[in-house]
Amino acid sequence: MKVAIVFDSAGTLVKIMRVIKDLKKNKFICNSQTVDIVDKKKGRALVIIKEDPLKVVDKENPEKLISDLLKEVEIGISYCNPPINREGIFKDRKTKVKELQEPLNILKRYEVETGYGSALIIDTYAGEVEYTIATAGCLFKEVKETIKQLKDLGVKVFIASGDRKGFIKRLAEITGVDERYIMAEAHQELKRDLIRNLKKEGYFTIMVGDGANDVPAMIESDLAVVTLQNGNVSRRALETADIKIYNIKEIVDICKKVINGEIKGRMQIKECS
């Protein structure tokens, strides 16, 4: 049997450090996923800066408008609560770059493996930056060995993530995942389409994630797995998953059972539960 597994990155392979600033309250938020914040309001978009924030955010004039910065750098929408107004991404005329620098400066105090990311949550209809975000992370200690064992079993391993390309390329380097099998800046439809295409190629597909943006791919997959290792899981992902795991290494035994015919897919899991 041909088996392909698609991993999300943040919270799944990487112990993520995420600093989110609520600009209206002027406070930092703990234990929240950015996609869950986006889901709370129509018209919100999670906008990522595709370039290294240490080069394009950290060194920028703090008093510069964020909307002007966004016009100068490469950006992407990794998640949204449609419908959105794309022009509204550039309409905020009061929020300054220092609001992006503040969460980044907090994370710069830590030693990280994956590099840094900067993002914003924007109300695209109000034309207002509501949250600024910085991310960084370190691999869960079991990840390298887990991926090695999966490859030894003949499982094709993919990483599909909304994170910027530099972040995901670095993750592929340190985990041993073939760079041909990574998908950066992947919104939820791209993850779903990856699963769909792998199924067309004859693979039994497993989607592993913990976020709301993993849910369409989970639904499309033959088997959906949610990982609880990071400790902060989207309710939608939890409700959609067929199997819950508490450590990423558990996925090896799941794949063995799939290969041996002990797990034949979603229907069998539901019949046994």
UniProtKB/Swiss-Prot annotation:
The active site is at D8 (4-aspartylphosphate intermediate). Optimum temperature is 50 degrees Celsius. Its cofactor is Mg(2+). It comes from the Archaea. It is an enzyme of class 3 (hydrolase). Keywords: ATP-binding, Hydrolase, Magnesium, Metal-binding, Nucleotide-binding, Phosphoprotein. Its EC number is 3.6.3.-. Inhibited by orthovanadate. The keyword Nucleotide-binding applies. The keyword Nucleotide-binding applies. InterPro entries: HAD-like_sf, HAD_sf. GO terms for molecular function: ATP binding; hydrolase activity; metal ion binding. Most probably acts as a phosphatase in the cytosol. Belongs to the cation transport ATPase (P-type) (TC 3.A.3) family. Type IB subfamily. This is Soluble P-type ATPase-like phosphatase. It comes from Methanocaldococcus jannaschii (strain ATCC 43067 / DSM 2661 / JAL-1 / JCM 10045 / NBRC 100440). The gene is patS.
